[in-house]
From Swiss-Prot:
CDD domains tied to this protein: Ribosomal_L1 (cd00403)
Annotated protein name in UniProt: Large ribosomal subunit protein uL1
UniProt KW keywords: Repressor, Ribonucleoprotein, Ribosomal protein, RNA-binding, rRNA-binding, Translation regulation, tRNA-binding
Keyword Ribonucleoprotein: yes
Chain ranges passing through the membrane: none
GO MF term list: rRNA binding; structural constituent of ribosome; tRNA binding
Family to which the UniProt record says this protein belongs: Belongs to the universal ribosomal protein uL1 family.
Subunit comment: Part of the 50S ribosomal subunit.
GO terms of biological process kind: regulation of translation; translation
Amino acid sequence: MPKVAKKKVAARAVVDRARKYTLQEACALVKQAAPAKFDETVDLAVRLGVNPRHADQMVRGAVVLPHGTGQSLRVLVFAKGEKAKEAEAAGADFVGEADLVNKVQEGFMDFDRVIATPDMMGLVGKLGRILGPRGLMPNPKVGTVTFDVKTAVSEAKAGKVEYRVEKAGIVHARIGKVSFAENALHVNADALIQALVRAKPATAKGIYLRSITMSSTMGPGVRIDPVHFIGKTEEA
């Protein structure tokens, strides 16, 4: 058996797949069970009791993780005049107007987050077919269409995570790296879960937090018991 396969088998043995853990236990297990030599990303998958096919049950938003994501984001901003200067001062990697729109249309995609001032959306709209499928299209619901570019850029650089429920009712989001301390992963995961709780649609009925699973890039999934959040989260 190859060495990598042996490590994966050993990692799975650490986790009881039939058990649901507390969030703190899950953070410790994910770190312990990560089999790769590189600094694996830690993700959270939350299955919600919503039907995203219904517009009034779409769950979408963004949250700043207190300890960041461990990823260095390249931020592109569509702005002009003073707002362009503010974006540059805040640390944006790329700032421009029509010239930048043209550059993206020509194939430039060396960025991870896109922010735009409202007056630029007429131009940015031309990039819908390019940015949309990649989840990069600026949207006021997640704070990426705003005149407050200074805050938007600063939050993106600090570890602001965007989330959106998929067709199966699941939200996937990065919450850090295996190298993070257990408490940092715990705080980040809790911040995301509480953001999802606050985003619960009024039309969602029954159990809202159906399941929560934490995993590293190469490691096994660790199930977290949603009951630990029910007191704060849902009315059936």
